[in-house]
Design a protein with these regions (language model features):
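Core catalytic region of metal-dependent phosphoesterases/phosphodiesterases
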Residues: 2-96
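Short hydrophobic-aromatic micro-motifs
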Residues: 97-101
Length: 101
């Protein structure tokens, strides 16, 4: 199983698009998002192409391929608009590793 990990999109449609493009190009089976999906946080500048509604639409389009844990900028409101579960501050993932020698 090929997994792709990404984090800290912070509502940037530009970076969300780049993430999904890389995910598709790599032909990964799951996209693991490590939090900070929509909101940029009060301490951060607005990210490039800040458009959380467009990010929502893009990610909801591949909702069955996403596993996500909550970041420090994610809120319960995010879960109301995202159609995939934003898990607690951690997630458990069973991974089988095979070695060929």
């Amino acid at each position: 199983m090929k997994l792709m990990f990404a984090s800290d999109i912070h509502g940037s449609y530009y970076y969300a698009q780049k993430t999904v493009e890389a995910y598709r190009e790599e032909k990964a089976e799951k996209l693991i998002l490590l939090g900070d999906i929509l909101y940029h946080g009060p301490r951060n500048d607005l990210p490039k192409d800040y458009a959380p509604k467009k990010v929502i639409e893009l990610l909801n389009g591949i909702k069955n391929e996403i596993l996500c844990v909550r970041g420090n900028c994610d809120t319960e409101v995010d879960q109301m608009v995202l159609e995939f579960p934003v898990l607690a501050d951690y997630g458990l993932l069973r991974v089988r590793v095979d070695f060929l020698h």
